[in-house]
């Protein structure tokens, strides 16, 4: 498998004005557009968290989007990514918004 096609999984948490600005909906749409799977949810800390899975090149693109763009009315202060690992298969079949 070529480097750019290696499947990875990474957890994320986004800080800033990311709740009440359709951040989850836009994250789901961007993830699906890139062909990624995973999930996104609001936390009781006022952040958004989730997990991305897919080819490393697509996950890197999504990480940049989460750090710099987000939804139009969001303001991202910080993006944390952790638990990155190579995976052999995807754990999800879609990109879901978790309530």
Swiss-Prot record:
Keyword annotations for this protein, in alphabetical order, are: Acetylation, Hydrolase
The record's Pfam families line, in alphabetical order, gives: Acylphosphatase
Which residues are catalytic? Answer: 24, 42
User: What InterPro entries does its record include?
Assistant: Acylphosphatase (IPR020456), Acylphosphatase-like_dom (IPR001792), Acylphosphatase-like_dom_sf (IPR036046), Acylphosphatase_CS (IPR017968)
Q: Which Gene3D superfamilies does this entry report, sorted A to Z? A: 3.30.70.100
One GO term under biological process is:
phosphate-containing compound metabolic process
Which family, according to the similarity comment? Belongs to the acylphosphatase family.
* Protein name (record): Acylphosphatase-1
Organism of this sequence: Homo sapiens
């Amino acid at each position: 498998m070529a480097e750019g096609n290696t499947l990875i999984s990474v957890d994320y948490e986004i800080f800033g004005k990311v709740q009440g600005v359709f951040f989850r909906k836009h994250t789901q749409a961007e993830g699906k557009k890139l062909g990624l799977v995973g999930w996104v949810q609001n936390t009781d800390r006022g952040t958004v968290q989730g997990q991305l899975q897919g080819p490393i090149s697509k996950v890197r693109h999504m990480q940049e989007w989460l750090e710099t763009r987000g939804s139009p009315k969001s303001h991202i202060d910080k993006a944390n990514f952790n638990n990155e690992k190579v995976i052999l298969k995807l754990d999800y079949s879609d990109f879901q918004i978790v309530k």
